[in-house]
Swiss-Prot record:
Gene Ontology BP, a term: lipoprotein biosynthetic process
Any one of the GO CC terms: plasma membrane
Subcellular location(s) of the protein: Cell inner membrane
A single MF term (Gene Ontology): phosphatidylglycerol-prolipoprotein diacylglyceryl transferase activity
Keywords, ordered alphabetically: Cell inner membrane, Cell membrane, Membrane, Transferase, Transmembrane, Transmembrane helix
Primary localization class, coarse: membrane
Transmembrane stretches, start-end: 19-39, 59-79, 93-113, 120-140, 181-201, 209-229, 243-263
Annotated disulfide bonds: none
Name assigned to this protein: Phosphatidylglycerol--prolipoprotein diacylglyceryl transferase
């Protein structure tokens, strides 16, 4: 077996198996796995912060309802030139095509509503969800691998991703191997997960919002770099949308941490948890 630093990644295809008209796809299975594992992690973390695990389970339903449709809507809007001609594909989420920034926005809105209804701190919930979110992102990126999508520029590095001719951009139709950006981001996200869990357990009295803000900064730094390698970025004119949003995420995260620790003030919040 070749070591990882000399690895050629080749997708076996997007489908796990097919029975008649029923198709089980890797993308859907990975999303489901990310939700289940993330839920279990957040439930476990909640026991350290005097939050009922059942409240986290209830929150998870809200997050799924808010995040997944918004993730798809975000993607479709920035690919409207294509989807306006293929309206029947707008809802085919199992084929791929969701945007994590849309999921984050939808999830935050759902969590804000939930926190007001439950009368708990929004930022306390955000701190419990952030490690699960980045874990889910690390898992979900492998869906891009199986779909042969979200890859980088052509490369001849020892580690590379083979892309079938039908999935290659026209500009690179004669190139077979590309940067495995799915792997870069998955590994980066796992490192961010380690940072967040270390903060959670080493600094149990950290101010509310700290872990989520650190997530915003660290994830966005990685995405800012990795997005520059990709060939299929969502664009708005000459701008890569994900890089613009990542810069905003870094800025908001740094401002929030400055507010908490340099100005020594609390973040605006819903009703504080007891």
């Amino acid at each position: 077996m070749l070591p990882l630093y000399w690895a050629v990644f080749t997708s076996p295809g997007p489908e796990i198996f097919r029975v008649g008209s029923v198709v089980i796809r890797w993308y859907g299975v990975l999303i489901a796995a990310a939700i289940v594992l993330g839920l279990q992690l957040s439930r476990h973390l909640a026991t350290y912060r005097r939050i009922k695990p059942d409240d986290i389970s209830d929150l998870a339903i809200w997050l799924v309802i808010g995040a997944i449709p918004c993730a798809r809507l975000y993607y479709v809007l920035f690919q409207w030139e294509y989807y306006s001609q293929h309206l029947d594909q707008v809802a085919t989420i199992w084929r791929g095509g969701i945007a994590i920034h849309g999921a984050i926005l939808g999830g935050m809105l759902a969590a804000l509503i939930f926190s007001r209804l439950k009368k708990v701190s929004f930022w306390q919930l955000a701190d419990l969800v952030a490690p699960s979110l980045i874990l889910g992102q690390a898992i979900g990126r492998w869906g891009n691998f199986f779909n042969s999508e979200a890859f980088g520029d052509p490369t001849d590095l020892p580690w590379k991703l083979f892309i079938p001719p039908a999935r290659r951009p026209l500009a690179y139709r004669n190139s077979a191997y590309f940067h495995p950006t799915f792997l870069y981001e998955s590994v980066w996200n796992l490192m961010v997960l380690g940072i967040l869990l270390a903060l959670f357990f080493k600094f149990p009295k950290a101010k509310k919002g700290t872990i989520f803000l650190v997530y915003a900064v660290t994830y966005s730094l990685g995405r800012l770099w990795i997005e520059g390698l990709r060939t299929d970025s969502l664009m708005l004119g000459p701008l890569r949308i994900a890089q613009v949003v990542s810069l905003i995420g870094i800025g908001i995260g740094m401002l929030g941490l400055t507010w908490l620790y340099l100005l020594k003030r609390s973040l605006p919040d819903t009703k504080q948890a007891s």
